[in-house]
Amino acid sequence: MSNSQKQNGSIIAIITMFFLYAMIAFVTNLGAPIGVIWKSQPGIDGNNMLGMMGNFMNFFAYLFMGIPAGKMLTKIGYKKSALIGIAVGFFGVLVQFISSFPTGIAGFCVYLLGAFISGFSVCILNTVVNPMLNLLGGGGNRGNQLNLIGGTLNSLTGTLTPMLVGALIGEVTKSTQMADVNLVLYIAMAVFAGAFVALTFIPIQDPELGKVTAETKFEHSPWSFRHCTLGVIPIFVYVGVEVGIPGALNFYLSDTTEKGAGLLENAATIGGAVAAMYWLLMLCGRLVSGFIAGKVSSRQLMLATTCVGMILILAAMVLPKTSTVTMPLFSIMTFSFTSAVVPVSALLLVLCGLCTSIMWASIFNLATEGLGKYTAQASGIFMMMVVGGGVLPLIQGWFSNFMGYMPSYFVYLLAMAYMFYYALFGCKNVNKDIPVE
């Protein structure tokens, strides 16, 4: 194959991975805003922990699929793995759509099954996207840069999803049903179907860097590398922080009881729009960092953003909800900017999106640097740890039931502190003597 053909194949592969990156956020971000609907249903009665169960089931699938997804990658390649992930995703969203027909707890259980199946899909797609972009970029800062740019599209769909769901719900009442957001599920199924057809006809060659064959011998494992082993926990807590901050914020603003933020009209619409601003700032952060990541190391980015993140969360926890600010929002229904008066704490938590925007790619880059042929195996392990995106919000939801929304954010404060520790001390590769070719 000529150099020009290889270059064209790499460009096609990168564009395709960017597109799949966007699909991951679309499906994943359905969990928390749809949880607002189920939380209001009879039998659940405003329980924040149960409201987060859909989000939990989505991420719980990672615990079962993480390592198998990594093995799938090494055996059948990137393209076939992606096609399987897309097909499973279509079926998962279809099951969620079916949950709008049964009523009460029966419908809730069907929805949880659909969220669980969708989790298998996004786990497979995540396993494909991150290592391939890292390898296509040649590792190092360039690999991190591609992941950050791809994450920009991920954040764009992550921004639109809660905004659209919130606009369709309006104000949550006991009559609010899953069928109210069927439009979002139609879009998701159409995207999966279209992507499957498109990817089937796109030629993608697996990158030679890090390629595994039947003759490849694994004398060690990713666990043999200290920086990879210590990087497992930051992946676990990071995903919980990324998903949990806007998810709980959406619950807080949508709650019209005395526990909530005190919004009286269109609370769910405002809650979804504010949560969307968090994802929008993640988009902006990834877009900007995608251009500076080649000059600033992943470690430096992590140290700076975790420090700022801890300050923002702590301030949000201590400020009373009577301290308010007029916050600019975007209305997806009118495609225009508007505003709403929300607690200052909400604005501070939204700003955390700028901090979390670079963390996934940076942690992944730090933890897989120098792994070579063990990269795909490590990716499978990291995909298992994405279950943190379901566990941490569930824990926070449990605490918020009796201690309130804002105090329960201590869960994410502690998570930020550990990520700071990893960037400061734990990310150095001290096992360079292990052969990785």
Which residues does each PLM region occupy?
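Central cavity-lining transmembrane alpha-helices of secondary-active solute carriers
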Residues: 52-73, 276-288, 388-391
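Extracytoplasmic gate region of multi-pass secondary transporters
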Residues: 31-33, 161, 223-280
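Hydrophobic core of transmembrane alpha-helices in multi-pass small-molecule transporters
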Residues: 106-125, 328-359
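C-terminal ends and interior cores of transmembrane alpha-helices
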Residues: 87-105, 308-338
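Conserved MFS/SLC helix-loop-helix module at the cytosolic interface between two early adjacent transmembrane helices
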Residues: 64-109
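Helix-loop-helix hairpin linking two adjacent transmembrane segments in secondary transporters
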Residues: 143-203
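Intracellular juxtamembrane helix-capping segments at the cytosolic ends
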Residues: 124-138, 356-372
